[in-house]
UniProtKB/Swiss-Prot annotation:
GO biological process, one term: translation
Tagged with keyword Ribosomal protein: yes
Family: Belongs to the bacterial ribosomal protein bS18 family.
Top-rank taxon, per record: Eukaryota
Assigned GO CC terms: chloroplast; mitochondrial small ribosomal subunit
Name of the gene encoding the protein in the UniProt record: rps18
InterPro entries recorded: Ribosomal_bS18 (IPR001648), Ribosomal_bS18_CS (IPR018275), Ribosomal_bS18_sf (IPR036870)
PANTHER family: 30S RIBOSOMAL PROTEIN S18, SMALL RIBOSOMAL SUBUNIT PROTEIN BS18M
Organism the protein comes from: Pisum sativum
Protein's name according to its UniProt entry: Small ribosomal subunit protein bS18c
Length: 110
């Protein structure tokens, strides 16, 4: 067969579908900083919808929540690397740790 008569065959590319960053139970709110940090770059910019793989409505709500958190100074407008690392550790969802109380020894009266 001539090259000119060959049919064009598309290469089979694997379609990656990553799990969405927003779960069904997550509230998009300016107070939910652990969620908002997922959508901010290291420089402090809001990541695009293509990068986040969010719907238009979710992206709009995330953008509004990030802007509200910045105005209320919960998030900085420009991130420094040290702030991002400290804040992410601080606001990560932590597993509840069961703590036992140690009994307080009372002093005896004389």
């Amino acid at each position: 067969m001539d090259k000119s008569k060959r049919l064009f065959v598309k290469s089979k590319q694997s379609i990656r579908r990553s799990s969405p960053l927003i779960q069904s139970g997550d509230r998009i709110d300016y107070k939910n900083l652990s969620l908002l940090f997922k959508f901010i770059s290291r420089q402090g910019k809001i990541l695009s919808r293509r990068v986040n793989k969010l719907t238009l409505k979710q992206q709009r709500l995330i953008t509004i929540a990030i802007k509200q958190a910045r105005i209320l100074s919960l998030l900085p407008f420009v991130n420094s690397s040290s702030f991002v690392n400290n804040a992410k550790k601080k606001y990560e969802k932590r597993k509840s740790i069961t703590r036992t109380r140690t009994p307080v020894l009372k002093k005896k009266k004389k």
